[in-house]
Amino acid sequence: MKQHRFASHTPEERRRLSNLGHIVEGLLLGAVGVLALLESTGVASWAATAWPILILVAGVLLLILIYPRHPFSDWPAIWRDAQQQQHTIMAAAIAVAGVAELLRGLGSVWGYVWPGVMLLIGGMFLIHEQHGTSAAAAKAVWQHRILGLTAIIAGLLRAAEVGTGSSPLAILWPLVLLAAAAQLVLYREPEGAFEIGHGHT
C-alpha cells in the first residue's frame, strides 16, 4: 500500500479521498440494510450472519482508509485532527458493533450495541468537525446533521426492535439505514472544503 504524509494531501486530494470514503461506507451500510431486510422478511436466513460481518468490514475498512495509508509517525497527528478523531471513533465503534452482532447468540444484551453505535454516530454527525471555508463548512455541517438525525432514528428503531421483537420495526430500521446509506453515497465535499480554516457552525 502506497503511503502519503498526512499533511501532504492537497485540498483537492482530501476532497476526493473524503468523497471516496463516504461512497464506500455508504455502499457497505446500504448492503447491511438490504441484508437486514432479507433477514427480517424471512427471505434469506443466512443474511442474519452476513450483515454483521459487513458492519465489521465497514469499521475495519474505514480505519484502514484513515491510518495505514500514512506513515506510523503521522498517526498521532491524524488523531489530533478533530475530524479524523471523530472518524476514528466511528470506525472503531462500527467494528465493535459488528463483533457484538455476531455474539448476539450469547445473550440479548449484545443486540443493543449496534443501535447504541448508530446513536453515537448520529450524535457525532450533529457536531461533526468540518475543515474549509465558512461557506463550505456550513454546507457540510447541514448535510451531516441531516445524516446524523437519520442515523439516530435508525438506532432508536433498532433498539426498540431488539427490546420488543416487533416485526414491523425489524423492517423499518433497515429502511431508515438505507436512507442514511444513500446520503453517504450521494455526499460530495463542497467546493472550498479543506481550503482554509476549520470549524463547525
Regions from the PLM with identified roles:
Residues 1-201:
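Peripheral, non-catalytic segments of secretory and membrane proteins
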